[in-house]
Curated annotation (Swiss-Prot):
Disulfide bonds join C54-C70, C148-C218, C179-C197, C208-C234. Glycans are attached at N170. Induction: Dexamethasone (DEX) induces expression of isoform beta and represses expression of isoform alpha. The alteration in expression is mediated by binding of glucocorticoid receptor to independent promoters adjacent to the alternative first exons of isoform alpha and isoform beta. It catalyses: Hydrolysis of proteins, including fibronectin, type IV collagen and nucleolin. Preferential cleavage: -Arg-|-Xaa-, -Lys-|-Xaa- >> -Phe-|-Xaa- in small molecule substrates. This is Granzyme A. Homodimer; disulfide-linked. Interacts with APEX1. It comes from Homo sapiens (Human). Residues 27-28 form a propeptide. Residues 29-259 form the Peptidase S1 domain. Abundant protease in the cytosolic granules of cytotoxic T-cells and NK-cells which activates caspase-independent pyroptosis when delivered into the target cell through the immunological synapse. It cleaves after Lys or Arg. Once delivered into the target cell, acts by catalyzing cleavage of gasdermin-B (GSDMB), releasing the pore-forming moiety of GSDMB, thereby triggering pyroptosis and target cell death. Cleaves APEX1 after 'Lys-31' and destroys its oxidative repair activity.
Length: 262
């Protein structure tokens, strides 16, 4: 599920201050196509319960990066090597989670830091169906106009259920000034420097409910994690998808968490 919500900023001064926070301070796919089976072997399907799914990326043999708002329970499954949700596939590796590590500065109200690491009970068997998606070497921002891709098993339109098969859509990074203007999010919520907006200004190309946690790849580099959008309005040009940027501080947290885990 890509989270969909609205939040009211108390004043313009608060909004401006949030936009200027330095980086060192603490969905089915809409408008896309089914991918060639197992052509995105880093994709992870998270079966949270019988009614809820998320996605993620395998970033080490026993580590998955997803969104913090994806709520797991003891029966939640981490499925590697999947193309279809329902079909039995010999490529699938089904695992359980040993421990969850939500980003310590995650704020559910603003969705800042909507990231979570999942340490798996066992290591994945790496093959042509299951591979690691490497983190970017630098936590650089992504320039407006950059072409990106996002994949997932989420909704294909707002009244649909999940897609049974993995789909992907091409989307474009949109300037934060545009995403925050009165014709788009209007600072509700604030799209800050540790987030990026991506979609189409004409609408119709987006991530959606069920795609939360999916990796955002821009020019082949892992740049963000699917977070939220307008409630029940996936693909609406007024609310492009919002992704948590893999900024320097987020990358440092990921690296230190993995190194420090037992």
């Amino acid at each position: 599920m890509r989270n969909s919500y609205r939040f009211l900023a108390s004043s313009l001064s608060v909004v401006v201050s949030l936009l200027l926070i330095p980086e060192d301070v603490c969905e089915k796919i809409i408008g896309g196509n089914e991918v060639t089976p197992h052509s995105r072997p880093y994709m992870v399907l998270l079966s949270l319960d019988r009614k809820t799914i998320c996605a993620g990326a395998l970033i080490a043999k026993d580590w998955v990066l997803t969104a913090a708002h994806c709520n797991l329970n003891k029966r939640s499954q981490v499925i590697l090597g999947a193309h279809s949700i329902t079909r039995e596939e010999p490529t699938k590796q089904i695992m359980l989670v040993k421990k969850e590590f939500p980003y310590p500065c995650y704020d559910p109200a603003t969705r800042e830091g909507d990231l979570k690491l999942l340490q798996l009970m066992e290591k994945a068997k790496i093959n042509k169906y299951v591979t690691i998606l490497h983190l970017p070497k630098k936590g650089d921002d992504v320039k407006p106009g950059t072409m990106c891709q996002v994949a997932g098993w989420g909704r294909t339109h707002n009244s649909a259920s999940w897609s049974d098969t993995l789909r992907e859509v091409n989307i474009t990074i949109i300037d934060r000034k545009v995403c925050n203007d009165r014709n788009h999010y209007n600072f509700n919520p604030v799209i800050g420097m540790n987030m990026v907006c991506a979609g189409s200004l004409r609408g119709g190309r987006d991530s959606c409910n069920g795609d939360s946690g999916s990796p955002l790849l821009c020019e082949g580099v892992f740049r963000g994690v699917t977070s939220f959008g307008l409630e029940n309005k996936c693909g609406d040009p007024r609310g492009p998808g919002v992704y948590i940027l893999l900024s320097k501080k987020h990358l440092n947290w990921i690296i230190m968490t993995i190194k420090g885990a037992v």
